[in-house]
């Protein structure tokens, strides 16, 4: 049975994502970050030649926060009702990450450069996994 609380629903584990820790000298780093308000997309250009565009919804769904990821295996929470979420602000955190402030009030979780890069490389797989979990839960992005 799924319980509804503040537009979120508990689910089984999300795909494993890159660890937040330990940038190495060879870790890709962004050379440009642009927020496209109208399209609700964040564009990141990395020094390894990759450029990724993320919908704000995708970044909200895959927030690295404990609120979304949980504090251990099996505690992940499926994010529902995020289709129209936007990003209100981006706060740098040292030289390794940013904190995103979403229009729905979510503002926890640090997005490291490694985490962004992993999300970009595997974006299609992660998105399809999210849609499958939504379907299985009978939940809506609206």
Predicted regions and their residues:
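Motif-centric detector for short Cys/His coordination patterns
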Residues: 2-142
